């Protein structure tokens, strides 16, 4: 991926000045506020604590990472077993058909093919080629800005290529991307390269001076893409659809040979080349650069990827990066990587080996290739030349000896719009489409309640069946933590293999052993971020302890917060939009187990454990993030007789219909608004004496 904006280490200071970072800096510093806003305070080290300060406990910071590694390894093993079972050409052909069906399941149905309404807003004449400034609509009112590089030749029609961009701020005008488009034109190709959503001339969240107020590229993708999940949309499909419609336009041009069309791109463009190979069969050749590896390598290396780079259900369906290219088999494909890339070259070689075996079975071993350049991430000259050689061979053109001399244009020269942004022309944004769909789903859904609501909750959260009573560990006695009661014991309740919910039991006197039986009523507090910290700092807990002196009092950290808050993906990255909490939330969607569903399952298993201890009546109290898991668990668990929620989200529709929101992906549920919304749950919980305290709207308490 190319640099978006400068963020060198030399600029990092201990004051509060703010900088913008590209994906490389995202990975180095692991920072972006969870609200999706682009500005980062550089001085992020916590202030020195007074001797009396207590640091929140976190004794299991690797638990979530190792759990996901295990889950993804199992998915990979199943996928490799399926690939290993292929023995004949017929087997391989059936496999290719199967992956195409699975990819369609991931990406969802294609939208309607509406008129492109193309227009050419300018032409740039150069020595051996010309550049046409093209705008077309991939969806009604949703313009795509593109440059069409056309060779000056009498040998028509020429092969065509769709060029996809990585996460460059200036999109199609980025030097490396101009270079491959111009290089192809000088070699006799027509190349249409277009701006991705949130980049170049297609910023989605603009200020009055037409700059991104969230941050171009990664930040805009995350902010729009996470929100889209609520209405059953996937940003990867939106970006792929732009590419499909770009191909539709390219094939209307008489200069282009419809039987010789390729697709290439680097980094985020390598992603789109890979996805487009999976969802579109008209390509005759493809060359993804600096993206293809394996999902397992990315996870084990703690490498976050954008929303659009993580297809929903992909891992659950047995798909890996190579499968999206296998969908195009046996057409010519070359996988381009880099030895010094953060996309692991070992995974590049593994993906290629899987494709190589498939192509051998398809009797086309020479139609798949591999090139790993010696340098770092980027569509540098060596990778571009490998792409040229491959495409010339596939298109029946003479061998390439090297890249022709290039002349790089200024960004402004390549702009298609008068002011350099489609926003200035009144274009619709991704958010506006999301808001409209949310409103449509709400009107269509109506009110949901009773057993229908409970079934919908189980199905949307993908909650597995619960069996038996969970085992637990008794951890070291907690002394002097300043809880509402003077003593506490922590129990690690095993909610599923590899996962423990950390549960504190408060006591008036010393206790070191298993929980006592006796009290029929218990209070269970489900924490927002840390039970340890909130038992000291949240006044609601103290109030309830005083109000219910006869009740046993427990507090719970579900997976991924408090005692198991991950320390992965960079220092202090947990709350970053590209950090560890997002990392596991997006992998959860690929595994088809929403992260909030897993957290809800933890609460349900803790409730099973409490029931086994003799607590037949539960007052469930929850705050913030924990209020969502608490809501669903209370809805599904009969022993919960009373519910108190503080800072619970008002509704998912409010998030879907607000351009600015601060709730993380871990709290958002895929396609939830097609089935129910939180007010349905709150209405149902009135029968359990629901008390709501200071509900939070889309900005999670950060409203101005």
What are these regions (language model features)?
Residues 149-151, 164, 194, 264-266, ...:
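Generic beta-strand/beta-sheet core signal
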Residues 7, 11-34:
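N-terminal secretory signal peptides and thylakoid transit peptides that target proteins
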Residues 156, 160-244, 251, 294-302, ...:
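Cap/lid segment of the alpha/beta-hydrolase catalytic domain
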Residues 158-159, 187-189, 258-260, 281-284, ...:
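Loop/turn elements at helix/coil->beta-strand transitions in domains of secreted/extracellular proteins
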Residues 48-144, 329, 336-502, 506-521, ...:
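Alpha/beta-hydrolase-fold serine-hydrolase catalytic core, especially in secreted/extracellular enzymes
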Residues 312-325, 356, 675-680:
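Alpha-helical scaffolding within the catalytic cores
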Residues 37-44:
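C-terminal segment of classical bacterial N-terminal signal peptides
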Residues 248-314, 606-674:
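Primarily recognizes the serine-hydrolase "nucleophile elbow" in alpha/beta-hydrolase
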């Amino acid at each position: 991926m190319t640099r978006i904006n400068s963020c060198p280490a030399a600029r990092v200071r201990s004051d509060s000045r703010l900088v913008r970072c590209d994906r490389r800096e995202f990975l180095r510093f692991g920072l972006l506020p969870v609200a999706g806003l682009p500005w980062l305070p550089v001085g992020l080290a916590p202030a020195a604590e007074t001797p009396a300060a207590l640091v929140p406990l976190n004794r299991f910071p690797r638990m979530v990472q190792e759990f996901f590694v295990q889950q993804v390894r199992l998915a990979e093993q199943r996928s490799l077993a399926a690939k290993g079972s292929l023995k004949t050409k017929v087997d391989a052909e059936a496999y290719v058909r199967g992956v195409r069906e699975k990819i369609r399941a991931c990406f969802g149905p294609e939208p309607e093919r509406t008129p492109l309404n193309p227009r050419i807003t300018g032409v740039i004449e150069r020595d051996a080629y010309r550049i046409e400034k093209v705008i077309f609509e991939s969806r009604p009112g949703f313009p795509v800005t593109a440059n069409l590089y056309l060779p000056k030749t009498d040998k028509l029609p020429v092969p065509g290529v769709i060029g996809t961009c990585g996460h460059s701020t200036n999109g199609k005008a980025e030097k490396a991307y101009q270079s491959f488009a111009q290089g192809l034109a000088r070699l006799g190709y027509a190349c249409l390269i277009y701006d991705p959503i949130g980049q170049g001339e297609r910023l989605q969240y603009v200020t009055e001076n037409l700059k991104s107020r969230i941050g171009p590229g990664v930040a805009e993708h995350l902010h729009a893409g996470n929100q889209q999940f609520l209405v059953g949309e996937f940003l990867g499909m939106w970006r792929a659809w732009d590419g499909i419609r770009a191909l539709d336009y390219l094939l209307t041009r008489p200069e282009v040979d419809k039987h010789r069309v390729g697709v290439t791109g680097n980094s985020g463009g390598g992603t789109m080349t890979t996805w487009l190979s999976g969802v579109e069969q008209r390509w005759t050749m493809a060359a993804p650069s600096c993206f293809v590896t394996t999902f397992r390598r990315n996870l084990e290396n703690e490498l976050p990827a954008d929303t659009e780079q993580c297809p929903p259900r992909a891992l659950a369906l047995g798909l890996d990066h190579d499968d999206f290219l296998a969908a195009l088999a046996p057409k010519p494909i070359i996988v381009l990587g880099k030895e010094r890339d953060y996309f692991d070259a070992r995974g590049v070689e593994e993906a290629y080996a899987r494709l190589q075996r498939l192509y051998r079975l398809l009797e086309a071993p020479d139609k798949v290739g591999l090139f790993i350049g010696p340098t770092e991430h980027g569509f540098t000259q060596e990778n571009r030349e490998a792409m040229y050689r491959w495409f010339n061979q596939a298109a029946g053109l003479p061998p390439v000896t090297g890249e022709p001399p290039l002349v790089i244009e200024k960004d402004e020269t390549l702009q298609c719009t008068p002011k350099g942004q489609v926003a200035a022309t009144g274009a619709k944004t991704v958010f506006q489409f999301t808001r409209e769909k949310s409103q449509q789903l709400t009107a269509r859904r109506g009110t949901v309640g009773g057993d229908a609501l409970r079934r919908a909750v189980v199905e949307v959260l993908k909650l597995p069946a619960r069996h038996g009573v969970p085992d637990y560990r008794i951890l070291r006695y907690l002394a002097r933590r300043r809880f509402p009661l003077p003593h506490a014991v922590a129990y690690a309740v095993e909610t599923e293999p590899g996962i423990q919910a950390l549960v504190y039991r408060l006591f008036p006197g010393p206790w070191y052993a298993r929980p006592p039986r006796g009290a029929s009523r218990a209070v269970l507090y489900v924490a927002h971020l840390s039970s340890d910290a909130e038992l000291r700092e949240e006044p609601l807990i103290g109030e309830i302890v005083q109000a219910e002196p006869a009740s046993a009092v427990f507090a719970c950290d579900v997976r991924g917060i408090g005692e198991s808050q991950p320390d992965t993906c960079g220092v202090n990255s947990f709350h970053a939009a590209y950090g560890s909490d997002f990392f596991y939330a997006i992998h959860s969607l690929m595994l088809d187990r929403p992260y909030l569903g897993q957290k809800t399952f933890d609460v349900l298993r803790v409730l099973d454990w409490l029931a086994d201890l003799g607590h037949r009546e539960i007052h469930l109290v929850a705050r913030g993030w924990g209020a969502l898991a608490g809501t669903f668990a209370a809805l599904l668990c009969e022993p919960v007789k009373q519910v108190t929620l503080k800072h619970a989200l008002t509704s998912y529709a409010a998030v879907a219909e607000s351009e600015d929101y601060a709730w993380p992906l871990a709290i958002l549920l895929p396609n939830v608004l097609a089935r129910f919304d939180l007010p349905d749950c709150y209405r149902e919980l009135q029968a359990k004496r629901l008390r709501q305290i200071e509900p939070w709207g889309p900005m999670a308490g950060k409203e101005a």
